[in-house]
């Protein structure tokens, strides 16, 4: 059996509520910029939820031909824009000689929800003949991968993961394993989501998952007293990851190394996490085992931290159970306090934050930290970014259905 290949991050692309590229998103994260505001895309008057993390000053026609864009749901559009940025950042040349060894693995938690709503109205109002022939290709979650592959010409391993809020992290983890075992030289991977629609807002509201707080400064407050649910966000986070051999051969810039991946199932409940965060704890331990490290080796953890009453507390318990005494010295921040919860895209954005934290020796804060929950007594990097020399960083994603996914990143050393 051949030795596992080392896997490094060489490119990044982002669309988020705090920036339309990686540079802006990261700068605003370090500044503690709040990307949550009143929803403008739909009329929220009938709903109890009125806030979300929308993209700002973003026009898809600046990036994709208008005719082509009309044949894609927003989640696919976002993936293409972020993937192009990541590939450009990596200076990755996809040509007839390399295409077979470059793959795409991008997930979406719910796919084309807006497309479904439009098509359903057409069907009900005007009958089946008015439903677009592009309806199914626009709807299905794997189409982000499909369209990015077509757009960039990448012909290697090609797939999509759908694990709700763990989607982005699971996608990167699966792509990591593909490169690690030598099935591809590079993968374009991450998550994308466009969930700010009538049906998504109504559905998540019905499940009592969303915050009904109309104050943009307190609606999303992970690990704080009085938190009442998550605030939805939209966007995409895409990485180019590749074997160290490939990256060094072409002189690529390396942000960080991916060294561990753990994924588990709760087998407990369709929306609630397992008691004491047992499933998340096992995923964190699996990721550390995969990386060959111990809890004391990790300096920073980008938490799932969605601002739900049960979810935050269970994640804190999981961290304490996994890290033991080392949890007292761990920096743990929830960047969702700034971006909102991007569902399937969140793991991609937070992988970018984790890698840049290592590279820049800075940790983005948990903003809105003014009324700490005494049961969530970790160092959550309150309100202001902190300088921190990081060797290992971890990123958690925990999804409806009991999906738990964790990645471990390492400061790159040749």
Swiss-Prot record:
TM region(s), chain numbering: none
CDD domains (alphabetical): KAS_I_II
Family listed: Belongs to the thiolase-like superfamily. Beta-ketoacyl-ACP synthases family.
Pfam families listed in its UniProt record: ketoacyl-synt, Ketoacyl-synt_C
GO-annotated biological processes: fatty acid biosynthetic process
Pathway: Lipid metabolism; fatty acid biosynthesis
Keywords of this entry: Acyltransferase, Fatty acid biosynthesis, Fatty acid metabolism, Lipid biosynthesis, Lipid metabolism, Transferase
PROSITE patterns: KS3_1, KS3_2
Entry GO MF terms: 3-oxoacyl-[acyl-carrier-protein] synthase activity
Role description: Involved in the type II fatty acid elongation cycle. Catalyzes the elongation of a wide range of acyl-ACP by the addition of two carbons from malonyl-ACP to an acyl acceptor. Can efficiently catalyze the conversion of palmitoleoyl-ACP (cis-hexadec-9-enoyl-ACP) to cis-vaccenoyl-ACP (cis-octadec-11-enoyl-ACP), an essential step in the thermal regulation of fatty acid composition.
Record-linked NCBIfam families: fabF, PRK06333.1, PRK07314.1
Protein name, per record: 3-oxoacyl-[acyl-carrier-protein] synthase 2
Residue span, Ketosynthase family 3 (KS3) domain: 4-411
Catalytic reaction list: a fatty acyl-[ACP] + malonyl-[ACP] + H(+) = a 3-oxoacyl-[ACP] + holo-[ACP] + CO2; (9Z)-hexadecenoyl-[ACP] + malonyl-[ACP] + H(+) = 3-oxo-(11Z)-octadecenoyl-[ACP] + holo-[ACP] + CO2
InterPro entries for the chain: 3-oxoacyl-ACP_synth-2, Beta-ketoacyl_synthase, Ketoacyl_synth_AS, Ketoacyl_synth_C, Ketoacyl_synth_N, PKS_Beta-ketoAc_synthase_dom, Thiolase-like
EC number: 2.3.1.179
SMART domains from the UniProt entry: PKS_KS (SM00825)
């Amino acid at each position: 059996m051949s030795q596992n290949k080392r896997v490094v991050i060489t490119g990044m692309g982002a669309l988020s509520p705090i920036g339309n590229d990686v540079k802006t998103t990261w700068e605003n994260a370090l500044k503690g910029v709040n990307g949550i505001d009143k929803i403008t895309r739909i009329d929220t008057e009938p709903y109890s939820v009125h806030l979300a993390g929308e993209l700002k000053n973003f026009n898809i026609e600046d990036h994709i031909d208008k005719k082509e864009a009309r044949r894609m749901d927003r989640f696919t559009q976002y993936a293409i824009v972020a993937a192009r940025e990541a590939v450009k950042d990596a200076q990755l040349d996809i040509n007839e000689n390399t295409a077979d060894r470059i793959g795409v693995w991008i997930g979406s938690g719910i796919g084309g929800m807006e497309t479904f709503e439009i098509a359903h109205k057409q069907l009900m109002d005007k009958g089946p003949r008015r439903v677009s022939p592009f309806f199914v290709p626009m709807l299905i979650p794997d189409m982000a991968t499909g369209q990015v592959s077509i757009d960039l010409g990448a012909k290697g391993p090609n797939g999509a993961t759908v694990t709700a809020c763990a989607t982005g992290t699971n996608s990167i983890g699966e792509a990591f394993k593909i490169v690690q075992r030598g099935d591809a030289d590079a993968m374009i991977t991450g998550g994308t989501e466009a969930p700010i629609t009538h049906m998504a807002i109504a559905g998540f509201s019905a499940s009592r998952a969303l915050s009904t707080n109309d104050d943009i400064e307190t609606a999303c407050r992970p690990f704080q007293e009085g938190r009442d649910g998550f605030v939805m966000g939209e966007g995409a986070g895409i990485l180019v990851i590749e074997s160290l051999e490939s990256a060094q051969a072409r002189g690529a810039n390396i942000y960080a190394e991916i060294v561990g991946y753990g994924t588990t199932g709760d087998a407990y409940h369709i929306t609630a996490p397992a008691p004491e965060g047992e499933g998340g704890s096992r995923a964190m331990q699996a990721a550390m085992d995969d990386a060959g490290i111990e809890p004391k080796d990790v300096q920073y953890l980008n938490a799932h931290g969605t601002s739900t009453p049960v979810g935050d507390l269970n994640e804190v318990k999981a961290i304490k159970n996994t890290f033991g005494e080392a949890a007292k010295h761990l920096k743990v921040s929830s960047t969702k306090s700034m971006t909102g919860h991007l569902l399937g895209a969140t793991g991609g954005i937070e992988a970018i934050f984790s890698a840049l934290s290592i590279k820049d020796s800075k940790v983005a804060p948990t903003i809105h930290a003014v009324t700490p929950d005494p049961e969530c007594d970790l160092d959550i990097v309150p309100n202001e970014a902190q300088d921190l020399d990081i060797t290992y960083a971890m990123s958690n994603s925990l999804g409806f259905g009991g999906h738990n996914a964790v990645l471990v990143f390492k400061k790159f050393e040749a």
